[in-house]
């Protein structure tokens, strides 16, 4: 049974015997959440499960959101805590309707991941476990950028043809974009010391599929594919909608372009340029990996 309480009662609720704290704040709210937890706990915080997906830049390095939260929790001295992260395809409406859903819970300690999975598993919610916290976190974040690119497939599949042809024949192009997305995700995950094989799982391909099939990032991608600039599409089509891929591109885009040449990550950098430079999407098909 779910009980909903006002935020003002948070202190009272968390001071009870708590098994797990689930954080689902926005990426910009990570430090705020850390501050609130430190107001309640002084020596030890119950197990934390982070649902937020994203990456940050700290001291010119990529920072996982679990590390950002850890840094916030340690800002006032030593305190005991353990943070896990959740990844995988889990659209809210489907979950609310209790359709079969598979996710992956990651913790550097696989035994801790297994322990927490037992709290969450039920007849429709299936929790896999992983000790590749980096791979799960990074895959979950960057798949938003790639789902935007795949969402553009219908518009960019071929120039100067009718909309009818694009509507019927864009799937070849979408598949090529998916293949390139997975290839690049593995490069980036490996660069950040995660496991390439994690991209093949729920946090990578699984979440990429769901996001590309109709999420907010894919929707923005469709507008970019139609030739709109990001600012025009945001203002006229998605003004009050959060587009996670755009937030991530602004956060890590410049760092990406310092660390990689366009030939290394041609699809990601094409999307980053379209967003951060506010230019029309120009996918460099000729740079794709066809090995």
Please place each PLM-identified region on the residue numbering.
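Glycine-rich anion/phosphate-binding loops
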Residues: 27-31, 127-130, 271
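Rossmann-like NAD(P)(H) cofactor-binding subdomain of soluble oxidoreductases
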Residues: 3-11, 15-98, 116
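Alpha-helical architecture
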Residues: 50, 86, 141-142, 205
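Hydrophobic alpha-helical packing residues
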Residues: 37, 69, 184-189, 252
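NAD(P)-dependent Rossmann-like dehydrogenase/reductase catalytic/cofactor-binding core
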Residues: 143, 150-158, 168-169, 175, ...
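Internal alpha-helical scaffold of NAD(P)-dependent oxidoreductase catalytic cores
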Residues: 40, 74-82, 100-197
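Short, small-residue-enriched loops and turns at beta-alpha junctions
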Residues: 55-58, 136-137, 210, 241
């Amino acid at each position: 049974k779910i009980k909903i309480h006002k935020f003002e009662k948070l202190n009272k609720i968390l001071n009870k015997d708590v098994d797990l704290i689930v954080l689902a704040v926005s990426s910009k709210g990570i430090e705020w959440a850390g501050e609130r937890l430190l107001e309640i706990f002084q020596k030890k915080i119950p197990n934390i499960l982070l649902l937020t997906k994203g990456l940050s830049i700290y001291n010119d390095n990529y920072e996982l959101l679990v590390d950002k939260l850890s840094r916030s929790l340690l800002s006032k001295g030593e305190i005991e805590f353990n943070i896990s992260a959740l990844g995988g395809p889990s659209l809210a409406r489907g979950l609310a309707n209790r359709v079969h859903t598979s996710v992956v819970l990651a913790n550097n300690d696989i035994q801790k991941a297994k322990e927490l999975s037992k709290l969450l598993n039920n007849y429709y919610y299936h929790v896999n476990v992983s000790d590749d916290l980096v791979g799960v976190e990074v895959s979950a974040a960057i798949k938003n950028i790639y789902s935007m690119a795949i969402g553009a497939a219908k518009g960019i599949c071929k120039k100067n043809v009718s909309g009818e042809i694009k509507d019927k024949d864009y799937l070849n192009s979408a598949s090529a974009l998916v293949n390139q997305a997975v290839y690049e995700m593995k490069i980036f995950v490996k660069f950040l010391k995660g496991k390439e094989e994690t991209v093949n799982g729920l946090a990578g391909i699984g979440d990429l599929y769901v996001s590309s099939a109709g999420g907010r990032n894919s929707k923005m991608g469709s507008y970019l594919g139609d030739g709109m600039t990001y600012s025009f599409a945001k203002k006229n089509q998605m003004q009050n909608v959060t587009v996670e891929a755009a937030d991530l591109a602004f956060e890590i885009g410049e760092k990406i372009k310092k660390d990689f040449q366009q030939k290394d990550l041609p699809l990601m950098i094409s999307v980053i340029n379209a967003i951060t430079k506010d230019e029309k999407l120009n996918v460099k098909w000729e740079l794709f990996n066809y090995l």
